[in-house]
């Protein structure tokens, strides 16, 4: 251990000096320095995960404050559009510039967006702030994993990946509780202001403790740097993603799917995304997504797996609380408490699997086994009825959440394992792009199924207009009908929610198929290879090596 809190790495076997092209060994931070860096990263990750759910219970007060009922959809969509659209561009930026400064820039953008939201004088300013915060989040989300990639040895990363899974599950579940606490006791503006001091703490810890080698752009002319960012590809990708998400957000709710606006958006999205694929095939390694990375077996399977597991996670995370509120007459706060079996089980499974993978090295068995548990648990959750008692809704949650916790984080670990270090930021960004896009698409699918099935099931109840179903919260549905129709009302809500849960069953089964295509790679193999080995410190594709991320070679 040296005086800087980093571990000194030994030279090649036999005590020989590092040979030509091997480069010096990398020094990973240890002890207090490492823990400080990871704390900063976890705080930033917590904020981005929290920001996606904390606003849910605050929206009614915001719309009352600004008299902006027509803008409700934009409070979530503005954040989501920039969050998804810029994920892959940030991956390219991380692969070319020093991740420390890219990450800090993303945190600063997120903080600016949060400050604008908190101080917003009108609804338009709030929407702009949400879009800026989403842009910052797109760099934080994958950036925290990319920095972990450069600060933690591969064989130890499963532990930190497991902790990240706990953070994500906790933030996603407690967001509505925190939002409700601020909204009811202080002000909805504190749903955004809380990000400022926590984000500042992240900035301080990363500034003080994270030190990375010089960026690959050193000595590269500015024009060449801009060309490395694939401007043509991103001019196709970013508008294409925005058009796709707008069509998904508006289709079936604001406008009919056959409406000219939706059709035009879908056609434009298709044309732009096809053009993006063409640009990537033309540019090859100089593109935003090198085709060889996309064709890597574990990356392709990992993206499919991530889309499917996120679909199930979002379905239950959003609609299971609605079941508790509508069917079990739970308050918003109490429904959050009733979700604790999911939070605790997924967190424990994620952390335990991290330690086990650290010991045994293989992550693929946990993806396969976790997918099977998810499929079984999701299937059992579709058996809920208005009379289902707590032993079942607790036990079925636990079974599904254990599978989710076992498997959800492993695709990003696979990207770090199978790719050489120059490609790792791109691979990690692809996984997180799949997560954000999959969640967005399937939430829209769930919402369409839920709304249509609810209207079909409850349309025959006397004196129950369609507007009452869409404008009444789940906690107040019992006030919509006379007592003699309450059973039909609850049965209709239950049936509509079970149809949504069946989407999660299908996606969980698809996870099993995707996981079966993952390669069986051992994260401990890189440790055994030692410094100078392929992908290892000082070796080809490794930090300090001739083809490493910091090596200065052109892409």
Curated annotation (Swiss-Prot):
<feature type="transmembrane region" description="Helical">
    <location>
        <begin position="101"/>
        <end position="121"/>
    </location>
</feature>
<dbReference type="GO" id="GO:0022857">
    <property type="term" value="F:transmembrane transporter activity"/>
</dbReference>
<feature type="transmembrane region" description="Helical">
    <location>
        <begin position="425"/>
        <end position="445"/>
    </location>
</feature>
<dbReference type="GO" id="GO:0005789">
    <property type="term" value="C:endoplasmic reticulum membrane"/>
</dbReference>
<comment type="function">
    <text>MFS-type transporter; part of the gene cluster that mediates the biosynthesis of viriditoxin, one of the 'classical' secondary metabolites produced by fungi and that has antibacterial activity. Is not essential for viriditoxin production.</text>
</comment>
<feature type="glycosylation site" description="N-linked (GlcNAc...) asparagine">
    <location>
        <position position="4"/>
    </location>
</feature>
<dbReference type="Pfam" id="PF07690">
    <property type="entry name" value="MFS_1"/>
</dbReference>
<comment type="similarity">
    <text>Belongs to the major facilitator superfamily. TCR/Tet family.</text>
</comment>
<protein>
    <recommendedName>
        <fullName>MFS-type transporter VdtG</fullName>
    </recommendedName>
</protein>
<feature type="transmembrane region" description="Helical">
    <location>
        <begin position="71"/>
        <end position="91"/>
    </location>
</feature>
<feature type="transmembrane region" description="Helical">
    <location>
        <begin position="262"/>
        <end position="282"/>
    </location>
</feature>
<dbReference type="InterPro" id="IPR036259">
    <property type="entry name" value="MFS_trans_sf"/>
</dbReference>
<keyword id="KW-0812">Transmembrane</keyword>
<dbReference type="GO" id="GO:0005886">
    <property type="term" value="C:plasma membrane"/>
</dbReference>
<feature type="transmembrane region" description="Helical">
    <location>
        <begin position="304"/>
        <end position="324"/>
    </location>
</feature>
<feature type="transmembrane region" description="Helical">
    <location>
        <begin position="364"/>
        <end position="384"/>
    </location>
</feature>
<feature type="glycosylation site" description="N-linked (GlcNAc...) asparagine">
    <location>
        <position position="329"/>
    </location>
</feature>
<feature type="transmembrane region" description="Helical">
    <location>
        <begin position="337"/>
        <end position="357"/>
    </location>
</feature>
<feature type="region of interest" description="Disordered">
    <location>
        <begin position="1"/>
        <end position="20"/>
    </location>
</feature>
<keyword id="KW-0325">Glycoprotein</keyword>
<feature type="transmembrane region" description="Helical">
    <location>
        <begin position="232"/>
        <end position="252"/>
    </location>
</feature>
<keyword id="KW-1133">Transmembrane helix</keyword>
<feature type="compositionally biased region" description="Gly residues">
    <location>
        <begin position="530"/>
        <end position="555"/>
    </location>
</feature>
<keyword id="KW-0256">Endoplasmic reticulum</keyword>
<feature type="transmembrane region" description="Helical">
    <location>
        <begin position="162"/>
        <end position="182"/>
    </location>
</feature>
<feature type="transmembrane region" description="Helical">
    <location>
        <begin position="132"/>
        <end position="152"/>
    </location>
</feature>
<feature type="glycosylation site" description="N-linked (GlcNAc...) asparagine">
    <location>
        <position position="122"/>
    </location>
</feature>
<keyword id="KW-0472">Membrane</keyword>
<feature type="region of interest" description="Disordered">
    <location>
        <begin position="528"/>
        <end position="555"/>
    </location>
</feature>
<feature type="glycosylation site" description="N-linked (GlcNAc...) asparagine">
    <location>
        <position position="185"/>
    </location>
</feature>
<feature type="transmembrane region" description="Helical">
    <location>
        <begin position="497"/>
        <end position="517"/>
    </location>
</feature>
<feature type="transmembrane region" description="Helical">
    <location>
        <begin position="30"/>
        <end position="50"/>
    </location>
</feature>
<feature type="transmembrane region" description="Helical">
    <location>
        <begin position="393"/>
        <end position="413"/>
    </location>
</feature>
<dbReference type="InterPro" id="IPR011701">
    <property type="entry name" value="MFS"/>
</dbReference>
<feature type="transmembrane region" description="Helical">
    <location>
        <begin position="190"/>
        <end position="210"/>
    </location>
</feature>
<dbReference type="InterPro" id="IPR020846">
    <property type="entry name" value="MFS_dom"/>
</dbReference>
């Amino acid at each position: 251990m040296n005086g800087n809190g980093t571990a000194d790495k030994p030279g090649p076997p036999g005590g020989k000096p590092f040979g030509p092209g091997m480069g010096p060994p990398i020094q990973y931070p240890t002890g207090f320095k490492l823990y400080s860096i990871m704390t900063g990263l976890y705080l930033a990750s917590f904020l981005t995960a929290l920001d996606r759910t904390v606003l849910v219970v605050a929206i009614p007060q915001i719309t009352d404050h600004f008299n902006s009922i027509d803008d409700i959809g934009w409070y979530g969509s503005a954040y989501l559009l920039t969050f998804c659209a810029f994920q892959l561009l940030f991956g390219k930026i991380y692969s070319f510039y020093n991740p420390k400064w890219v990450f800090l820039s993303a945190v600063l953008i997120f903080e600016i967006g949060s400050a604008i939201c908190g101080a917003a004088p009108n609804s338009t300013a709030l929407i702009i702030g949400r879009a800026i915060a989403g842009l910052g989040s797109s760099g934080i989300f994958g950036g925290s994993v990319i920095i972990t990639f450069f600060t933690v040895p591969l064989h130890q990363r499963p532990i930190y990946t497991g902790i990240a899974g706990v953070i994500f599950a906790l933030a996603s579940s407690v967001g509505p509780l925190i939002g409700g606490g601020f909204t009811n006791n202080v002000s909805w503006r504190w749903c955004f202001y809380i990000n400022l001091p926590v984000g500042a703490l992240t900035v301080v810890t990363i500034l003080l403790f994270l030190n990375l080698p010089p960026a690959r752009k050193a000595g590269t002319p500015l024009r060449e740097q801009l060309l490395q960012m694939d401007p043509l590809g991103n001019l196709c990708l970013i508008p294409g993603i925005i058009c796709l998400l707008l069509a998904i957000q508006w289709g079936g709710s604001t406008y009919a799917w056959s409406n000219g606006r939706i059709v035009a958006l879908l056609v434009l999205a298709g044309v732009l995304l096809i053009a993006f694929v063409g640009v990537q095939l033309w540019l090859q390694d100089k593109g935003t997504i090198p085709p060889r990375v996309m064709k890597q077996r574990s990356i392709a399977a990992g993206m499919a797996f991530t889309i499917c597991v996120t679909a199930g996670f979002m379905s239950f995370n959003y609609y299971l609380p609605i079941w508790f509120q509508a069917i079990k007459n739970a308050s918003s706060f109490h429904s959050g408490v009733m979700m604790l079996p999911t939070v605790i089980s997924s967190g424990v499974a994620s952390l335990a699997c991290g330690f086990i993978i650290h010991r045994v090295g293989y992550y693929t068995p946990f993806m396969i086994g976790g997918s099977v548990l998810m499929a079984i648990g999701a299937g059992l959750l579709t058996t809920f009825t208005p009379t289902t008692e707590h032993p079942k809704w607790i036990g079925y949650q636990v079974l599904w959440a254990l599978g989710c916790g076992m498997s959800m984080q492993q695709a990003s670990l696979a990207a770090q394992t199978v790719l050489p270090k120059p490609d790792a930021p791109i691979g990690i960004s692809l996984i997180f792009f799949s997560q954000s896009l999959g969640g967005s698409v399937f939430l829209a699918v769930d919402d369409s199924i839920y709304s249509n099935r609810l209207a079909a099931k409850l349309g025959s109840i006397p004196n129950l207009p369609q507007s009452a179903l869409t404008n009444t919260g789940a906690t107040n549905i019992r006030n919509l009908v006379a007592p003699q129709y309450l059973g039909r009302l609850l049965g209709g809500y239950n049936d509509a929610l079970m149809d949504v849960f069946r989407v999660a069953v299908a996606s969980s089964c698809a996870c099993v198929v995707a996981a079966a295509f993952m390669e069986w790679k051992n994260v401990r193999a890189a440790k055994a290879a030692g410094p100078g080995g392929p992908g290892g410190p000082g070796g080809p594709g490794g930090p300090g090596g001739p083809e490493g991320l910091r090596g200065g070679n052109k892409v």
